[in-house]
Amino acid sequence: MTNLEKLQEMIDNSNNIVFFGGAGVSTESGIPDFRGTNGLYNQECKYNPEEMLSLSFFIAHPDEFYNFYKNKLLSLNAKPNAAHFKLAELEKAGKLKAIITQNIDGLHQAAGSKNIYELHGSMHSYHCTKCGKEFDMDYILNSKLVPYCDDCHGLVKPDIVLYQENLDFEVLANARREIAKADMLIVAGTSLSVYPAAGLLDAFFGKYLVVINKDMPKKDLHVKLYIDEPVGEVLDKITV
């Protein structure tokens, strides 16, 4: 049996699939992986990305933060790829119960998926750090470099988890609950190097753990199937 045939059989035999995805899921949509060859971590910048994407940097240098954010992070022209669409199809068929993503791009929603846990937040929503008023992407794009609240003039922040910030406890708890209930877990496009997100996999005691990634994650996993190919190419060949 080929790896694809094995994957198809596992999906056919599962009724509670959870998908856990990282940056590699969106690279086929043209969004570079932070840690990949062409990623932000390998580009020459005045500050390193980890510093620029920290809460303290956002507060101290909102202009430089937003310059970096708008030019390097916002992926406005990206469209869902085959992986996003196939996952939405699997959810519609009642096979896939949840998507847990480390991405902030909103491409799973754009493809039609409903039950999504965004561990690192979303670039599609924003809030005033002073009064809490909520804003959408259009407000940010139509504002000058740094967006300020139209009510209280407070600094507006993206609803993404920056370095020095904790992940949302409720999102984490719900994601862990979904993984604990799963009979199949597909881990794709992530090196599982970021905690506490990577620790969520410890909650999985189901039958099939599948990894689709360029490299096998360093984390010790009881993997049933490992596929070293682009996520979209693999999932595109799956029949629902």
Put a short name on every predicted segment.
Residues M1-V240:
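Conserved catalytic core of sirtuin-type NAD+-dependent deacylases
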